[in-house]
C-alpha cells in the first residue's frame, strides 16, 4: 500500500489535498469486518500553521453543533460518563486516556523545551487487544520549536470522509490548550493515518468533496468571527 505526503498552510488546504490524493490514487481493498470495500492509502498531511484561516472545511459530515460537541469530548471529556454504561458499552474515550498525561507533557516541556519525550500514548494494550473497536488514535507527540508548539498525531485507521476533519480540528484545539498552558504559540500540525480510507458507501460523497475542492467553490469557512460564534452558541445544547 502506498503512503502519500501532502501539505498546506491551513488545515482545510492540507485535508483537501489528502482527500484528492485518496480519491485519485487510493487502492480498493476488501473490508470483511463490515462486509464492504474501502478505498485506502497511507497518508500524512502536514499543516504549516495549525490556526491559519480559513480554518473550517465544508467537506465533512456534520455542522457546528457536531463539531463543538466533538471538541468538548476530546478536550473536556463531556462523554467520559458513558464509559462502562449502556447496551453498547464504551470501553474508553480519547479524553479519558489523554487527561492523565497532559500534566506530564506540560511539565516535561516546561522543564526542557527541546524535549522529544512529550508523548501521550492513547493505545492501551490491556484493553485494545480484546476490543472489537480498539482506539484509532495511537499517540500524540508535542514539541516546542521556535517558541511554538508543534503536534504530531498517529492513527492506525482514519475514515477520511466521515471522521478525519473533525479529528484533526479537535486535536488542534487540544494543541492550542496545551500551548496556552505552556505560554507558547501554536505551530504546525502533522496527521498520519496508516490506513486513510473511505468506505464504499461514501465513495460518491468523496467524489463530491473532491469536485467541490477542485472547482474551488465554497469549500471553506472562516473560523474567527463566524464559525467560532456558531460553535459557541451550541455549548448550552451540548
Regions found by a protein language model. Give the residues of each.
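Terminal, non-catalytic protein-protein interaction segments that mediate quaternary/complex assembly
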Residues: 1-238
